[in-house]
Structures are given as structure tokens and as C-alpha cells.
């Protein structure tokens, strides 16, 4: 695991965009896209590079981490619609090459297995972007999720539904269930890139990177992965015991070694 500490959230977004651009410029790439506030700066920077420098996403495809059960893709708050408005519609990534779990599937119990099979058929995910919750969750894998879990239906906590109610007309309109990639599914991506900033994420980052491997902190599953880059700002790094070493290692990173 490589931990990259930047001064500001803007620098975090630039570094993550650098990583994604490296993959895209090397050829056909399968991206794992996350929603939420953490990757927004990275998406904006990638869109700017497409607009101003011609960064080409025409050979890329993408898979989303999760989707609400019961919402059509056309709904403004479906994660498919959100990722289009936040990123896909601002670059030349074919929306037909962007896949999400089907929250309207006629066999919702089997949709997770179908989605995992679609990822495998595409050759797997090259680089997966991830946020992290204050409780260490990634995707909708809340504390207690099995570290080897697959894409499946999860029940939203009442607090999560209340938190998301601001995006809907009322809390009654917020779905009770989501389809989310499991921790085992996420771990099969070849490169995991976690994004976090702000003091509110400091304890979760410390638990994920330096704490015990535990279902209590789902993001700690990254400790078992062979290629993880955690890109955070100084505030999110404030609880890391080895922060000075991470800064030292980055300062002396060989010029030939990419993220």
C-alpha cells in the first residue's frame, strides 16, 4: 500500500487524475467509478484534460460500484445518472460502455452474480476509484460486511436513508436497498485508488491503513491487495502513525516508479 499525502483536496484530485490518465493513455482501459464527493475533483480535472488537452476516453469502459434497487437508470438520482452528469457526459466515454448493476432486474437476487460475470468477461477492472465512509465503509459494504463478499443486495441503514433524503423529494422516496460490489469483487481490481480529504475521514483512513484487518473496518481489506494507492490531504492524514515515513518515501520515490 502506498500512501500519498497532498497539501489540499485540489492536489488530491490532480494526483488521482494523473493515475487515471496514465492508464487511459496506455490503451484500452476498464475503469471502476465511484460516486460521492470524494472523486468529484478528480472527475473535474479529467474532464478539463479531455477538453483542453484531448485526453481520449473513446477506448475506455467503466463499471460502477453500486446502484439503488428499484430506480430506473433514467431517474436523476440513480447512480448511473449521477456518474453521467458528474463525469461521463463531460468526456468522450461512450455511455453504452458504462455499466452499473441493474436495480430494476426481474431477478434481483441473481443480478449480483450477473454483474460480477460482466466484469470478468470484460477482463476485470484495471483501476478502481474508491471513497471511504467515516465508519470505514467502501461502496455500501458497511461494518460487518464479509471481506470476501460479492456483488449483492444490501439494506440501507435508516441513517443512510436520512442522509440521502436531501437528493429526493422526501425520505419516503429513498430506496431501502442497493446493489453493491462486495469487498471480494472490489479486491479483484488490479489497482485500487482510495481518495479522502478532511479531518472527518482521518480516523477511518488510519483504521484502514494501519489498523487490524477486520470486518469492523471494511476498507481494511485493502491491506491484502498487492497494488493500492491511498491519496489523501494533510487533514485526512492527521491520525496516521507513520505519516512522516509516507512523506519520506514519496519524496524519495524513484523517477521510474509510477503510482
Curated annotation (Swiss-Prot):
Hydrolase among keywords: yes
An example Gene Ontology biological process: glucosamine catabolic process
Catalytic residues (UniProt): 66, 135, 137, 142
Annotated keywords: Carbohydrate metabolism, Hydrolase
This protein's record includes keyword Hydrolase: yes
Annotated EC: 3.5.99.6
A Pfam family reported for this protein in Swiss-Prot or TrEMBL: Glucosamine_iso
Recorded superkingdom: Bacteria
Reactions accelerated catalytically: alpha-D-glucosamine 6-phosphate + H2O = beta-D-fructose 6-phosphate + NH4(+)
InterPro entries in alphabetical order: Glc/Gal-6P_isomerase, Glucosamine6P_isomerase, Glucosamine6P_isomerase_CS, NagB/RpiA_transferase-like
Enzyme class: hydrolase
A GO term, aspect molecular function: glucosamine-6-phosphate deaminase activity
GO CC annotations, alphabetized: cytoplasm
Pathway it works in: Amino-sugar metabolism; N-acetylneuraminate degradation; D-fructose 6-phosphate from N-acetylneuraminate: step 5/5
Family: Belongs to the glucosamine/galactosamine-6-phosphate isomerase family. NagB subfamily.
Described purpose of this protein according to its UniProt entry: Catalyzes the reversible isomerization-deamination of glucosamine 6-phosphate (GlcN6P) to form fructose 6-phosphate (Fru6P) and ammonium ion.
Entries under HAMAP family matching the protein: GlcN6P_deamin (MF_01241)
The protein, known as: Glucosamine-6-phosphate deaminase
Biological classification of the source: Bacteria, Bacillati, Actinomycetota, Actinomycetes, Mycobacteriales
Amino acid at each position: 500500500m502506498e500512501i500519498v499525502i497532498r497539501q489540499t483536496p485540489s492536489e488530491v484530485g490532480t494526483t488521482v487524475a494523473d493515475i487515471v490518465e496514465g492508464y487511459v493513455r496506455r490503451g484500452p482501459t476498464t475503469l471502476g467509478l465511484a460516486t460521492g464527493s470524494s472523486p468529484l475533483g478528480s472527475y473535474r480535472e479529467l474532464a478539463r484534460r479531455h477538453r483542453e488537452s484531448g485526453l481520449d476516453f473513446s477506448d475506455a469502459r467503466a463499471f460502477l460500484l453500486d446502484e439503488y434497487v428499484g430506480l430506473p437508470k433514467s431517474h436523476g438520482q440513480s447512480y448511473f445518472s449521477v456518474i453521467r452528469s458528474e463525469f461521463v457526459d463531460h468526456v468522450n466515454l461512450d455511455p453504452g460502455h458504462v455499466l452499473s448493476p441493474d436495480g430494476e432486474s426481474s431477478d434481483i437476487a441473481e443480478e449480483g452474480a450477473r454483474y460480477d460475470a460482466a466484469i470478468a468477461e470484460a477482463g476485470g477492472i484495471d483501476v478502481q476509484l474508491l471513497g471511504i465512509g467515516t465508519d470505514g465503509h467502501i461502496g455500501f459494504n458497511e461494518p460487518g460486511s464479509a471481506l470476501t463478499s460479492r456483488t449483492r443486495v444490501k439494506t440501507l441503514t435508516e441513517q443512510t436513508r436520512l442522509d440521502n433524503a436531501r437528493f429526493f423529494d422526501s425520505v419516503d422516496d429513498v430506496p431501502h436497498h442497493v446493489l453493491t460490489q462486495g469487498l471480494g469483487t472490489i479486491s479483484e481490481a488490479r489497482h485500487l485508488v482510495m481518495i479522502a480529504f478532511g479531518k472527518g475521514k482521518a480516523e477511518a483512513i488510519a483504521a484502514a491503513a494501519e489498523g487490524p484487518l477486520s470486518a469492523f473496518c471494511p476498507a481494511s481489506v485493502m491491506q491484502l491487495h498487492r497494488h493500492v494507492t491511498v491519496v489523501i490531504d494533510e487533514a485526512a492524514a492527521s491520525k496516521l502513525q507513520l505519516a512522516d515515513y509516507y512523506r519520506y518515501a514519496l519524496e524519495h520515490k524513484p523517477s521510474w516508479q509510477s503510482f
